[in-house]
Amino acid sequence: MQLKEIIENNAEVVSDQILRVDSFINHMIDPNVMMEIGEEFARRFRDDKITKVLTIEASGIAIGLTTALALRTPLLFAKKKVPSTLGDSYVSNIYSFTKNESVTVSVAKQYLKSDDKILIVDDFLARGEALKGLAHLVKQADAELVGVGIVIEKAFQGGGKALRDAGVRIESLIKVSSLEGGKLHLEE
């Protein structure tokens, strides 16, 4: 996969906690990279009979769409504001350390059912707060969380380990071991 080279050549280390990938993943999107990401997640979860891909707006939508296309299944994204038109919904609170704020996310109950087999996808996994919030939506619906696909896991922030220890299957395409000294260090 060319993703590793793209990240090594284009990602910007902002601090020892923050990696910026907005030139190809979460601001300006390279569709070829997104298709490759979606196809790789589909390959890893192809035999799991996924019925829906779940993500969070906005950064997860492109990743979710290409994954859903490759799996030939619907994409459902959690909304960060509960619109008045949403009706009966599952709701979860998520704290963002990057933005230093809490956000309420929601999914309409009519789109997340107890017989669903869910694959959650997102761009980053750091402390795991977004994933915990999305998993909480799945649990409220009594649906099955089959696994999680992450483009970039900041392994040094511990979210992935905690979720794996809790029994969640996580497939990360890239694992960052450190951003110390302004340098990107990847796990092999």
From Swiss-Prot:
Q: Which InterPro entries match?
A: PRibTrfase_dom (IPR000836), PRTase-like (IPR029057), Pur/Pyrimidine_PRTase (IPR050118), Xanthine_PRibTrfase (IPR010079)
Classify the source by domain of life. Bacteria
What reaction is this protein's catalytic activity? XMP + diphosphate = xanthine + 5-phospho-alpha-D-ribose 1-diphosphate
The annotated pathway is: Purine metabolism; XMP biosynthesis via salvage pathway; XMP from xanthine: step 1/1
Protein species of origin:
Desulforamulus reducens (strain ATCC BAA-1160 / DSM 100696 / MI-1)
Provide the function of this protein.
Answer: Converts the preformed base xanthine, a product of nucleic acid breakdown, to xanthosine 5'-monophosphate (XMP), so it can be reused for RNA or DNA synthesis.
Keyword Cytoplasm recorded: yes
According to the record's subunit comment, the protein's assembly and interactions are:
Homodimer.
Query: Is the Signal keyword given for this protein?
Result: no
Q: Which UniProt keywords apply?
A: Cytoplasm, Glycosyltransferase, Purine salvage, Transferase
Q: Which PANTHER family match?
A: HYPOXANTHINE/GUANINE PHOSPHORIBOSYLTRANSFERASE (PTHR43864), XANTHINE PHOSPHORIBOSYLTRANSFERASE (PTHR43864:SF1)
> Under which name does UniProt file this protein?
Xanthine phosphoribosyltransferase
Give the binding site residues for 5-phospho-alpha-D-ribose 1-diphosphate: 126-130
The residues that hold xanthine are 19, 26, 154
